[in-house]
Swiss-Prot record:
Belongs to the protein kinase superfamily. AGC Ser/Thr protein kinase family. cGMP subfamily. It catalyses: L-seryl-[protein] + ATP = O-phospho-L-seryl-[protein] + ADP + H(+); L-threonyl-[protein] + ATP = O-phospho-L-threonyl-[protein] + ADP + H(+). Its main location: membrane. It is an enzyme of class 2 (transferase). The modification Phosphothreonine is found at T609. This is cGMP-dependent protein kinase 2. It comes from Mus musculus (Mouse). 3',5'-cyclic GMP 1 binds at G232, E233, L234, A235, R242, T243. CDD domains: CAP_ED, STKc_cGK.
Amino acid sequence: MGNGSVKPKHAKHPDGHSGNLSNEALRSKVLELERELRRKDAELQEREYHLKELREQLAKQTVAIAELTEELQSKCIQLNKLQDVIHVQGGSPLQASPDKVPLDVHRKTSGLVSLHSRRGAKAGVSAEPTTRTYDLNKPPEFSFEKARVRKDSSEKKLITDALNKNQFLKRLDPQQIKDMVECMYGEKLSTGSYVIKQGEPGNHIFVLAEGRLEVFQGEKLLSSIPMWTTFGELAILYNCTRTASVKAITNVKTWALDREVFQNIMRRTAQARDEEYRNFLRSVSLLKNLPEDKLTKIIDCLEVEYYDKGDYIIREGEEGSTFFILAKGKVKVTQSTEGHDQPQLIKTLQKGEYFGEKALISDDVRSANIIAEENDVACLVIDRETFNQTVGTFDELQKYLEGYVATLNRDDEKRHAKRSMSSWKLSKALSLEMIQLKEKVARFSSTSPFQNLEIIATLGVGGFGRVELVKVKNENVAFAMKCIRKKHIVDTKQQEHVYSEKRILEELCSPFIVKLYRTFKDNKYVYMLLEACLGGELWSILRDRGSFDEPTSKFCVACVTEAFDYLHLLGIIYRDLKPENLILDADGYLKLVDFGFAKKIGSGQKTWTFCGTPEYVAPEVILNKGHDFSVDFWSLGILVYELLTGNPPFSGIDQMMTYNLILKGIEKMDFPRKITRRPEDLIRRLCRQNPTERLGNLKNGINDIKKHRWLNGFNWEGLKARSLPSPLRRELSGPIDHSYFDKYPPEKGVPPDEMSGWDKDF
């Protein structure tokens, strides 16, 4: 025998019951485990039920918080409006019912209005224009390669994650986020230093990488900023003053990006994408001859769809209405053939190639299979319905390209001349009056306008300066003089916008747009001598009434629609519609004023400068995607909402919150009861997130707005001929009656001279 271990034999119970005892013990253990399992199961069910209750409570609380937040925003707006009607000197008691405030309320108040008492008035904002011809200190041409800053992969990931957690930035394209990360640069600050100072102009966005930061408003501590959090993002959209301070409590490191680089990144990526898509479309035989504006609309309609290896994009024999362009990856084309059980490979398609184009003409029975050859294949797609609504049916486009449009235009001109002779006569009379007034003021000194003019009253104030009611000395001829501080224009880099306003207004002559007669300049100001419209501001009437009824709102919307129709035909986008920029003439007709953000663009082109009023800007402006005439249609929808309710639909406790509300969209928003079904439909169709889907931007243009059911039966010809009575007309005692305007204190201080010479051609 070996020395290995020997297994002992089991002892046998003398009565032979050892096996039975073992089985009993096992059975007992099983029963005990089953009881324990049932107990645990019951406990788990109880916890799941409790968790369900907690989730339901959380959902209710979330809804309640959202409702309270919305109510708080509404109360804030109402509070601002109430404060607006309390005058600084001897403030009169508030009216019990805003709906009963008479039209001539301004004749019954005499107190001065401080600048702060107009808090309810919405202010425009703007970044530096993308073309800065008149900025003598403009930066050199942007170079992405020069702007890049080296980082390791872990830093890039942490910065990327921080940017993607931000409510605004997470909506940007992945390529834009990637480029932002590449260009952010590191900054180290010692304890006690300020990353941001309250009251100073902002120009950077930051990500906290190391250390501890706290946020203060005055001396009050508001919060601390966690590591890898993004802050200061409003400053990369446009010029703004910081509303709080951010102080380093320890030594800190941040990653920063300035506004100039951010805006160049946004423009660069969007333009590169548009150019690539345009080249794709130019390669399609059905589309290559379309004009630029049609191609641009198709580009804006294209959506990206992704497929993994083996996915069928198209199946043979199916009906289809979608056209595809391969933007990334490879696909194979297979087709059933005689003598083979399985479809046979016909060819392989790569980036830039297209398929399904017949679907744009009519229902197409697919003649082959298109199958993704690899993961993450990307296709640009557009369906026939979208194509037809946006640019027209293929037959309509063919007629357009064959020259039928010239004949149609001639017929339209004849019909228009026959239908609108009264409005043509009115336009001729307006032009004659304008020429006569221009000849009168042409004799005035270009640098000393007040040798010939005297100031009667202040009509309005703003960050730019003031608007004064002036009259020709010894004559009963009045104008509105816009006095713009040159130093302010240079500080905010708005030279291009001021020149643009001058050039555009010099070109215009419409009964729905304020007229420019002459410009002047001296060492402190540039001046615009404008038509005096003394019926008052639409904003102040809306403020006093609370809201308008539907007939009044329709009249206002119709005036704006006619102004937009005129501007867009000339290739001009307005970009700053709001009640504050609508003024009443002596007949109660509305006119657009303040063309500081207006711009002339070519057919099919876009512009990139962030500008407008926060509550009215369109999503594509916020996201720096480039924008065109469709932003005016978006703002028209917002105006309809504000006229009917007294408040714009998107208004947060700060500008960034307002932008996030806009980006969430109007589609799921509940409308108040005072907006009936038809105006609600108009608003929703004007405020589509996708610009190509907006009413006014479809194939029939602005006529779709005029023919909308809410405006059905409106007297457009009477409006253009100014024979339609205005529901907003108020009596004026003469050409210098300014009683419908708030009263303002005199300007404090004298602005410094500004002698850089940017205004030499003004």
